[in-house]
């Protein structure tokens, strides 16, 4: 084929903009490795415990939409940790409005735990 014709041919399937979702176990291990490489010791312990609890709690989920949502959010978290943007992250009002009361409670507990760690290191 001529080079000009090749440019006119469309791909059979659209290109994927986002990266594919990692399976649960490799994602879990990658998060723990990222914690080890990127987080301070105190935050790493807190983060590891939280990740272990969340993955254990979601182990028995059957709904594919919940599984995809869970893995997608944790993969986004992994990108934040690897990219170093975790320390500058802010929660928008829209994100907060989407949370259930239980999630807001978990967020508050996490905030209190990180404050205690910050006070101990001073």
Curated annotation (Swiss-Prot):
It is found in: Mitochondrion matrix. GO terms for cellular component: mitochondrial intermembrane space; mitochondrial matrix. It holds the Pfam family Complex1_LYR_2. PANTHER family: DC11 ACN9 HOMOLOG, SUCCINATE DEHYDROGENASE ASSEMBLY FACTOR 3, MITOCHONDRIAL. This is Succinate dehydrogenase assembly factor 3, mitochondrial. GO terms for biological process: carbon utilization; gluconeogenesis; mitochondrial respiratory chain complex II assembly; regulation of gluconeogenesis; succinate metabolic process. Keywords: Chaperone, Gluconeogenesis, Mitochondrion, Transit peptide. It comes from Candida albicans (strain SC5314 / ATCC MYA-2876). Interacts with the iron-sulfur protein subunit within the SDH catalytic dimer. Plays an essential role in the assembly of succinate dehydrogenase (SDH), an enzyme complex (also referred to as respiratory complex II) that is a component of both the tricarboxylic acid (TCA) cycle and the mitochondrial electron transport chain, and which couples the oxidation of succinate to fumarate with the reduction of ubiquinone (coenzyme Q) to ubiquinol. Promotes maturation of the iron-sulfur protein subunit of the SDH catalytic dimer, protecting it from the deleterious effects of oxidants. May act together with SDHAF1. InterPro entries: SDHAF3/Sdh7. Residues 1-47 form a transit peptide. Belongs to the complex I LYR family. SDHAF3 subfamily. Its main location: mitochondrion.
């Amino acid at each position: 084929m001529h080079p000009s014709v090749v440019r006119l041919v469309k791909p059979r399937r659209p290109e994927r903009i986002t990266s594919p979702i990692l399976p649960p176990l490799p994602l879990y291990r990658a998060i723990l490795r990222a914690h080890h490489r990127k987080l301070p010791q105190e935050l790493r312990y807190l983060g590891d415990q939280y990740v272990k609890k969340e993955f254990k709690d979601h182990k028995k989920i059957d709904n594919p939409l919940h599984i995809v949502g869970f893995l997608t959010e944790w993969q986004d978290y992994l990108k934040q940790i690897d990219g170093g943007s975790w320390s500058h992250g802010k929660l928008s009002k829209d994100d907060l409005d989407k949370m259930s009361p239980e999630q807001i409670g978990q967020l508050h507990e996490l905030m209190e735990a990180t404050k205690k760690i910050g006070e101990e290191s001073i």
